[in-house]
């Protein structure tokens, strides 16, 4: 018997075992689910150090260097945090029928319903000072409707159980577990979780941590490549699919590949007749609002923007890809120079993700003026800046293709004043740049508080058609908080999925969301642990993970000590 035949039989067995437990999962009551969450939290706490160390080895990072902190942060910390968000939400479902919304529920002048969802706990206020998050609902949702849009699956007693295939992302190791947990506890699905080949070495650790679900037959974890993924996508016992990847991957799943796939897409004839959701790529903009910035402001925001690029060696769908500036702003050149300085001071990283060298070469061949920074080894790429890309350029690779490596472009828009610039910048982001996943808007406090300019900034926040709009810091916060929905702006279709269809995380279980809006201070304190020059990030992020595993006032001093040594 061939190896592929054995593998196929294992995949079929996993699908059959899950299908047999679909209805049983539907019958698991909320108290049992809370108990499962507690078991999962203990399981992920046990594997946290091994998980972080394994990914650091893949990425070639020294565990004793500050940059190692990011793998604690975007790995076990985020999953433990999300489990706590889910637990609180389920307690709300048990006690009142729906998760408790921690902040006020308001309406915008146009009637759109907005729910303040963060901070939720005392720990949120201590660890994320100055950070506030809202969920903006679909315009048709009213205040009276809102409660009915939460936790619908916990009130639907008629729908049959279903199996969801989760195709995990290969770039951020927490994506797969987070998506699996979303599908289990928010959508009421049993889950067949296939790891991406890049991080399939984590399968034994995830099986250990998620054993409470596996032992009860509600989760199966499998590995394999494209052939195994295709087999599962077409499997008759798989009812729906959620994928993290590129738009091309989504289209291949739904319509197939080659000429036949292109023809099916054009004719609207999908290859598979099952729902496919996904979080796909994005050319993520950083929209800079002109202001009277000091040299310290420029240095801070340069580090802020560079940190959005170099995290995970640039292999993030939410990495900074296009910096948008006002052509007439006196600080434009100074900000670019500060970005250059920070890139030059940042050690290059292993380009571990498949295709990185080819993508980088494609961009620099299109832009020979690209500026390279660092002294990369043979398995590394230089940090790369392409400044001054004409904003009206047609078929511009920097605007239409996600680089997915350590490369960022900059463009400038002509406008007579800040208000006009913001209108142009919003239209440019919405209509020219590929994708609708996330955008960061950087504005200093004085500008934001100016009566006329502040209104223009708020109009920009409202008009940006992105699933996450973050003011002043990396929009990846929307991925990390867990309580906010993460996904593309609604409206994409299977034949043109853009940055994706549907949302994940979304711990408060809203069904009718338009976007998340996150607001932070222009300059944060304490210094953000994801900043590239944080001097104790590896210690701090390990302590944060320990704290998230077992929160207590007794553990707080150790976190504070490392936070203040940034």
List each language-model region with its residue ranges.
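PLP-dependent aminotransferase-like
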Residues: 142, 163, 175-227
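N-terminal Rossmann-like NAD(P)+-binding subdomain of aldehyde/semialdehyde dehydrogenases
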Residues: 1-150, 196-200, 209-214, 557, ...
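C-terminal core of ALDH-fold dehydrogenases
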Residues: 35, 378, 422-535
